């Protein structure tokens, strides 16, 4: 399935993100909604750890257009609700996290788990189911190591399935390393990247920019399809009654 409009590839540091992908755990083609780095200020120097690409299913565009078409990139960037709609919308998402610096699975998964649990407890939605899902999540990563250029990939199903896969190169296809069934965990992974307290402001801003442009093009195409008949209709004489 082709994306709704033309999208371009992106490069973050030395890592390229293709315009479309067919990820593990999905039968669909997803388009690149945005990409950016994650980093931290360490001793006065900004250090980049990972490059992140966020992909969405084609049906995301009409879904998001209902509420967000006509908004500027800055308006979308500033809207917590917009990113919640991206995270929770009824369409597939795929996130590729490529390491710029070496990272162990334990380091990565424990930080993600910590953020998820803190968020759930803060909003009162943490249950035993989430606790078990987190344990499975930690187990998947426990013995993994990720040298520079390796990728951690998440396919998020609207049904609540989180497919996790790993690659030592830029491949995004192949078999899944694990599938965890928990809707809150599935959504929390992407939320931790582009949500209110997301770890990648760069990816968040880029998603807003690219999606705003896609919605603008989608709206323009819709207007071109329906505009002409509407114009012709307006020329029909009105007969008084």
Curated annotation (Swiss-Prot):
Keyword terms: Flavonoid biosynthesis, Isomerase
**Source species, please?**
Petunia hybrida
What EC class does the entry list? isomerase
Q: InterPro entries given for it? A: CFI (IPR044164), Chalcone_isomerase (IPR016087), Chalcone_isomerase_3-sand (IPR016088), Chalcone_isomerase_bundle_sf (IPR016089), Chalcone_isomerase_sf (IPR036298)
| Entry's family note | Belongs to the chalcone isomerase family.
Misc. remarks from the entry: Part of the biosynthetic pathway for all classes of flavonoids, a large class of secondary plant metabolites, many of which are brightly colored.
Q: Name one GO molecular function term.
A: chalcone isomerase activity
The gene behind this protein is CHI3
Site label Important for catalytic activity, positions:
108
The free-text function statement in the UniProt record for this protein reads:
Catalyzes the intramolecular cyclization of bicyclic chalcones into tricyclic (S)-flavanones. Responsible for the isomerization of 4,2',4',6'-tetrahydroxychalcone (also termed chalcone) into naringenin.
Name of the protein in its database record: Chalcone--flavanone isomerase C
A family per Pfam:
Chalcone
The pathway this protein participates in, as annotated, is: Secondary metabolite biosynthesis; flavonoid biosynthesis
Work out whether the entry's keyword set contains Protease. no
A Gene Ontology biological process in which this protein takes part is: flavonoid biosynthetic process
Q: Which residues bind substrate?
A: 50, 115, 192
Q: Which reaction does it catalyse?
A: a chalcone = a flavanone
Q: What is its EC number?
A: 5.5.1.6
